[in-house]
């Protein structure tokens, strides 16, 4: 396998693949997917790189990209790399204050923005960002503020050097590009404290490509990947770079909420996702089964049982299934499994990397039982994504797979997972104290995650900082309980409360549609959502479902009381990070009255 520096990667692939499709994006006016060939991708990156020189961008300068997923994000990335510049992605959902912090911390002069929301947020803090000189707007539909005298649209930016007059400078910079150059600074939104900029160098990505080539030999240039998670997230960013390195076609999903439509239009072979995606699939299947009766219901249940035995008890362990079991499995593969996959849009599936949170055992078993190759993994921004992931055979349900080649893992004090290797960050941008606290003198990066190794498989137990201590001195892992309860089809979001409290309670955001359906079925009258959620029958429904799911936990770990919320946790109120992780301190503050009420005698 040949490894190219990111500054030339797209051009080398264009030489190899020419008119083959490299990227696709959805035109929302025509509802058509527009293809971009490798040749066009390369030409656009070259034009972007030249326009950057015309704009005045210098080597190792920090460039901001504040946008939802768009092809322009990749043009900007690779145009910057050709100039030895550094790209800093901001989450499309970032608030003006979050954008202001990153712009000032990284001293960004040029910020590329996506749509109206990002433009408005960036322009509103322009005066508070001394380094900021100009916004470059991807979407022509954005309406500029009447006071804005400096911003330009991306097509105007590209027109700054249509003749490639600065190509000699670009070529000179590219020739000087090194693996030791900084590639990205990825700001972790952080559930506590201010964001930290994780520095990822070109050598981090080169090593990530190498170890994934060893681990994922079945990924080919015939694959089609759906780009679903934000390109700001290291999981999707590193994955998309890997796809480009492997010649995989990347289909860019602009709006996360449209994934159920776009996945059916593209029918990809690959897609990075988070456990919540599969939890919704599982909940949908359970709902369908609960509505069926007689033979159809029996067949659906049998199909899952047969799949579990065939794929998990036999194939997973490298054993050959008995002939009758195999024939039964093949029947269901052509009927029930095929229908399920087609309904989701993944009947062409090769494999589906899944990470970002714990995958409940029930979900993992179900997905593999119906013949979907979900590759569960574990990684961090600081490790250029993957630390460990499933193998096709020999994976262990409940684990996060086996450690990637040449990544060193050690279990330290408090069972903390420590990492060392060429994919690990050199530290946090302009934060020497935070870097020294995270990377010890022997080069071990301290993840803050607790876990253990067993037979070469890595298991996560909890986030060390998230451990709660009850007023009775018992330690509770809220994430373990939340992961278990969140698989219930009636539960959308959950926050476990226990710190310095005498027992465990929970704030629960229900799936409102399912609750309304249940009320209709049971003849429950109500005038508003608050009244419905307080109804004794609804309270009893949730009590029973919670008690069933939490049986495996010790008595002191179980939810004793809960409150059903009438609206979801939100990023706007600061309750969720940009990666939708709970900010527990904010939740505790925002819902203090409701929480205190649960502990009244």
Residue ranges and their predicted role:
Residues 27-30, 117-178, 285-339:
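ANL superfamily adenylate-forming
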Residues 206-224, 231-337, 348:
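Conserved AMP-binding/adenylation subdomain of ANL enzymes
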